[in-house]
């Protein structure tokens, strides 16, 4: 009896971790100096020191909350009946499978350090992934009444309003984070003179406290339905007006972020919201729904025509055509530099003897004649097609006061530099950082579409083949940067991504599939399918009679927004904790509604 009374009593303190996740976590912005440890790789800078303002302390704060939630979750489960615990474990069986596979992936990780402590620009190591699962389970366990949902809704609105206030100001050209008084809050005084925050995005582009404009798109698509729910269902008029202003600020932030994924996801969510609203409020909703869909498409086309920020990028997704390139690939091997160029296969070799050097060039196995300039520093050869290609001899500084011979070739509008004097028996490519690395021609599932979606075609195309390699347990949490072919410099050039280090695949599903394995991706999707099944039954197939059903619908739409945006964005500590909270809250609301229907005798 005592335990039952404890469960019925609305404990506001139990909601505090969830309130902090939706209200405070996205706002945390504090300076942290990171040593990436990536300088051991030739494709990264020798200097491994970077500044982080948006990720590290968000992760620390979240992990502290996760520990608290785990303790409280164990306590809550201890008060439940055997039937309730059985229902809990069955509901979260896919989550347990996903987390188990994440643990196994960490055990087999290509780098334990990153999988346990986190990667620069990502910060989703194993402890954070476990925290996501704990968040969903905790939300499911402690949210039991409509009043508790309202207690969670208000901090969410406050958090959204703070995040979007910064965003709207950035949209108007005033970046609050660059102001001196804010700098003193987020950067320790001892290093303020030498280190300060400087935005890397153009003036007027919104990134707010979410690290990157892409995640503004995910944030808005996920929380816009929640803001709209607050407009209609908070009891106090002042709160409803405040929520309405916040919803407008969310849309302005989305517009300023120029996030194409966010635009598509938010539009999908809004159309689905209108569809569900019409179904509930209009008798012959099925006659109006097609018109709403047409209106949505018209708005999208209008946005593209008027060149709204980021909207023209959406059009590119549907109009993308395969591009052909003269330079197909470059491989540095022990037997020369292998080049596929305009349908021919070239092999370039350099012979060095003291201060003398010479070249041998093979085209499809046939040696070409070489001519040298009077100075001898430039060699030329003519292809069967009649095109002349020049090879220029240069000096490369191997060490202080130590120089060796290297050569550069202009191909398809770009100079490529090589040497066989840096690694015994091997040719190496000298990248834009001046570091000697192997140049590879990595498998690419989307060859010719590298520029699609702001060069996402490049990273997607080279990530897809990794799924077969890491099918079972993945490469390990936060190790994408280590297994992605960062040294396919020809593909980089085609994608206009020279020098860009990809720490994430810009796709939630590829991120999960590569890092923790395709099996874990299936478990991840199963986590949502469990929720989706109950939501479709609850929100599409019957009319709403209680506000909890409307709020549950908003939560459902929020999760849809996150997953749609995930087609072009990744999971990141700035937004993912809120998604997992919504997933747990949505499951809790479905449970509440099922209990109500059972009580009313409705099957």
Regions found by a protein language model. Give the residues of each.
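Juxtamembrane membrane-water interface segments that cap and precede transmembrane helices
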Residues: 37-54, 112-115, 193-209, 458, ...
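Interfacial loop-to-helix junctions that mark the boundaries of transmembrane helices
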Residues: 42-60, 84-90, 119-123
């Amino acid at each position: 009896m005592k335990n039952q009374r404890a469960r019925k009593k609305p404990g506001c303190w139990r909601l505090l971790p969830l309130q902090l996740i939706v209200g405070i976590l996205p706002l945390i912005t504090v300076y942290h100096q990171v040593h990436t440890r990536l300088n051991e790789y030739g494709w990264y800078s020798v200097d491994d020191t970077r500044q982080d303002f948006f990720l590290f302390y968000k992760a620390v704060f979240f992990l502290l909350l996760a520990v608290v939630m785990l303790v409280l979750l164990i306590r809550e489960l201890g008060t439940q009946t055997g039937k309730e615990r059985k229902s809990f474990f069955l509901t979260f069986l896919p989550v347990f499978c996903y987390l188990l596979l994440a643990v196994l992936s960490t055990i087999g990780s290509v780098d334990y350090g990153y999988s346990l402590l986190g990667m620069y620009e990502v910060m989703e190591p194993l402890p954070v992934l476990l925290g996501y699962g704990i968040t969903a389970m905790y939300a499911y366990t402690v949210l039991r009444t409509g009043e508790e949902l309202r207690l969670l809704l208000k901090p969410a609105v406050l958090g959204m309003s703070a995040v979007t206030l910064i965003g709207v100001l950035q949209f108007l050209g005033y970046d609050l984070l660059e102001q001196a008084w804010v700098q003193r809050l987020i950067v320790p005084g001892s290093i303020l003179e030498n280190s300060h925050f400087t935005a890397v995005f153009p003036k007027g582009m919104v990134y707010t406290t979410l690290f990157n404009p892409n995640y503004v798109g995910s944030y808005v698509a996920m929380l816009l339905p929640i803001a709209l729910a607050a407009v209609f269902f908070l009891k106090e008029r002042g709160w409803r007006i405040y929520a309405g202003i916040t919803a407008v600020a969310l849309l302005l932030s989305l517009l300023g972020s120029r996030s194409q994924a966010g635009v598509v996801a938010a539009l999908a969510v809004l159309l689905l919201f209108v569809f569900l609203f019409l179904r509930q409020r209009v008798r012959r909703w099925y006659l109006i729904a097609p018109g709403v869909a047409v209106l949505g498409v018209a708005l999208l086309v209008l946005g593209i025509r008027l060149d709204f920020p980021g909207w023209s990028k959406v059009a590119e997704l549907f109009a993308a055509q395969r591009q052909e390139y003269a330079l197909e690939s470059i491989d540095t091997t022990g037997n020369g530099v292998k080049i596929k160029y305009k349908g021919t296969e070239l092999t370039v070799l350099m012979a060095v003897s003291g201060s003398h050097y010479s070249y041998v060039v093979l085209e499809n196995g046939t040696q070409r004649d070489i001519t040298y300039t009077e100075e001898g520093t430039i060699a030329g050869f003519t292809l069967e097609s009649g095109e002349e290609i020049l090879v220029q001899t240069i000096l490369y500084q191997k060490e202080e006061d130590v120089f060796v011979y290297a050569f550069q070739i202009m191909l398809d509008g770009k100079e490529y530099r090589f040497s066989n004097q840096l690694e015994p028996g091997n040719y190496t490519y000298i990248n834009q950082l001046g570091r000697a690395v192997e140049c590879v021609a990595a498998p690419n599932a989307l060859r010719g579409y590298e520029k699609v979606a702001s060069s996402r075609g490049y990273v997607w195309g080279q990530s897809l083949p990794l799924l077969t390699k890491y099918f079972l347990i993945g490469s390990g949490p936060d190790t994408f940067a280590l297994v992605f072919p960062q040294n396919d410099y020809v593909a980089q050039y085609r994608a206009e991504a020279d020098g860009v280090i990809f720490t994430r695949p810009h796709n939630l599903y590829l991120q999960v599939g590569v890092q923790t394995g395709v099996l874990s991706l299936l478990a991840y999707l199963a986590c949502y399918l469990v929720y989706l099944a109950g939501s479709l039954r609850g929100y599409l197939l019957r009319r709403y009679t209680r506000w909890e059903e409307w709020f549950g619908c908003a939560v459902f739409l929020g999760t849809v927004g996150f997953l749609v945006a995930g087609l072009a964005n990744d999971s990141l500590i700035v937004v993912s904790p809120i998604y997992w909270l919504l997933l747990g809250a949505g499951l809790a609301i479905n449970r509440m509604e099922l209990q109500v229907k059972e009580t009313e005798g409705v099957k």
